[in-house]
UniProtKB/Swiss-Prot annotation:
Annotated positions binding Fe cation: 36, 64, 67
InterPro entries: Hyd_form_HypD, HypD_1, HypD_2_sf
Record-given protein name: Hydrogenase expression/formation protein HupD
Family according to the record: Belongs to the HypD family.
Gene Ontology MF terms: 4 iron, 4 sulfur cluster binding; carbon monoxide binding; iron ion binding
Species whose genome carries this gene: Azotobacter chroococcum mcd 1
Gene3D superfamilies, A to Z: 6.10.20.100, HypD, alpha/beta domain 2
A Gene Ontology biological process term: protein maturation
Presence of keyword Metal-binding: yes
Keyword terms of this UniProt record: Iron, Metal-binding
Organism superkingdom: Bacteria
Pfam families in the cross-refs: HypD
Amino acid sequence: MKYVDEFRDGATARQLAARIAAEADPARQYRLMEFCGGHTHAIFRYGIPDLLPASVRLIHGPGCPVCVMPIGRLDMAIELARRPEVILCTYGDMLRVPASGRVSLLKARAESAAVRMLYSPAEALKLAQDNPSKEVVFFAIGFETTTPPTALVIEQAQRLGLKNFSVFCNHVLTPAAMHAILATPEARAGTLQLDGFIGPAHVSTVIGSAPYAPFPQQYGTPLVIAGFEPLDLLQALLMLVRQLNEGRAEVENQFTRAVTAEGNRKAKALTERVFEVRESFEWRGLGAVPHSALQIREAFAEFNAERRFALEPRTGLENKACECPAILRGAKSPRDCKLFGNPCTPDNPLGSCMVSSEGACAAWYAYGRQRQAAVEVAR
């Protein structure tokens, strides 16, 4: 199958891994962070860490949109869903994320809240048309990839004159969060050292490669945009190793079959028409990050659920035993959490990192435990 099988070829993967092992200096460390939930999943699924030399270490960043949602915003969504006049709809993974007191949208639905799962924002628009006596609120989440579809339905709602449709906007921005990662307390203290970034795939198809230029310029941190297949990731890792060996810090694009420098101009223009950048936004694990999220422009304010329902900011209560915030910062791994595997599992998630398949904990639970057990048996 074109563009799938050829990027999963085992012989080529072994050749790339051998090249990385040959070129990686065993006397130094290569600490590389992926910033995409799809990459996290692929890294575990295809056993990429098992192919790398000990000097190349992969660190998982805040690339899972479900995982980075702060509990306070989820509390606000649950408050909305419990209003008798509201139907709240969102993507499936968000239904299971624990909020304050381990309440989730799924539990709120079991207690009679009108919560619907959808696959596309267009379904929310149709729901509003079919239920004129209800207030339909789309709980919008995600990075730049999922933002244009939300912008499109807001424009469509305005053209249709829909009075019972609004959006609770929680779209976040990748480059701002990457800046924040390099400014975390662990990074400043030197306990979290990052030598390079694996740039996100889907996000980069929208924003292009140009927005990553500040990372080599300001921080001396190289970045290579990679696709999702195992050969994509291995080639990107080899490119990062070569940059670091040569003392270079550049933005390189391994995923040339889908990513350009300028990105998707139409998608970016659509987003720009409907949204503007917030002054600040709270991220799980990172705290308040300046200019890291979007809000609905004044021209579309009638579709802003925060304004329509006069929602007040909430401070959520984190599970103190859950290490998800530190895992999202790259400061800890899933194995460092005492809840991991028991009692926290995909069937009983105590933190957001265990909910989505793109979360580091869920990916490690699905694929990493078996490899760890095999390593321990081999010892």
